[in-house]
Amino acid sequence: MLDQQLLIGTVFLAGLASFLSPCIFPIIPIYFGILSKGGKKVLNTFLFILGLSLTFVSLGFSFGFLGNILFSNTTRIIAGVIVIILGIHQLGIFKIGLLERTKLVEIKTSGKSTALEAFVLGLTFSLGWTPCIGPILASVLALSGDEGSALYGASMMFVYVLGLATPFVLFSFFSDSLLKRAKGLNKHLDKFKIGGGILIIVMGILLITNNFS
């Protein structure tokens, strides 16, 4: 039970670390500028979260299903080694060029942000920034596939989305005060990135040692 609670906490922190990544956190005010149109900021934020949840939970479901077919002790160890390499990349010891790229997806919005536009913005957020948060995301997906259950994989990614989405919810309710304070965090983003790298390495070690089985 303790191991499972530790796993859930680790995955939740991984989602939070994704929010604080140097490529996402600085542009949060832009997203809230769009979501605030029409005076339905809270509703639009939840629809935005629904959009990004659809992508990530679907990924978890798929990896959990594939894990049932492909995962063995050997593949688990290989996956753990790859996750550790991704963690080292996150620390900046060396760079993997593919993971430094982002696919910027432009979305045209009307004068007022509609429910559909907020949902689509969530989908494009997921697809556009996946390369940037790739090391963390890949680590969580590896953990999702380890149990060989599609529902387990989906639930792990749901926990990841909770970690990623919680700051969005807080910003939607307290955007004015939080956005002002958030500017001061920009100078610490490199430290958050290092923390994310350490978290990734820990997940890789846990995969190799199979501590969550």
Swiss-Prot record:
GO biological process: cytochrome complex assembly
Function: Could be involved in cytochrome c synthesis.
Membrane topology listed for this record: Multi-pass membrane protein
Entry GO CC: plasma membrane
Statement: the UniProt record of this protein carries the keyword ATP-binding: no
InterPro entries: Cyt_c_assmbl_TM_dom, Cytochrome_c-biogenesis_DsbD
Compartment(s) of residence: Cell membrane
UniProt KW Membrane keyword: yes
UniProt keyword terms in alphabetical order: Cell membrane, Cytochrome c-type biogenesis, Membrane, Transmembrane, Transmembrane helix
Assigned protein family: Belongs to the DsbD family.
Membrane-crossing segments per the record: 15-35, 46-66, 77-97, 118-138, 154-174, 192-212
Leader peptide range in chain numbering: none
Name the record gives this protein: Putative cytochrome c-type biogenesis protein HI_1454
PANTHER family: CYTOCHROME C-TYPE BIOGENESIS PROTEIN HI_1454-RELATED
Organism taxonomic ancestry: Bacteria, Pseudomonadati, Pseudomonadota, Gammaproteobacteria, Pasteurellales
Biological source species: Haemophilus influenzae (strain ATCC 51907 / DSM 11121 / KW20 / Rd)
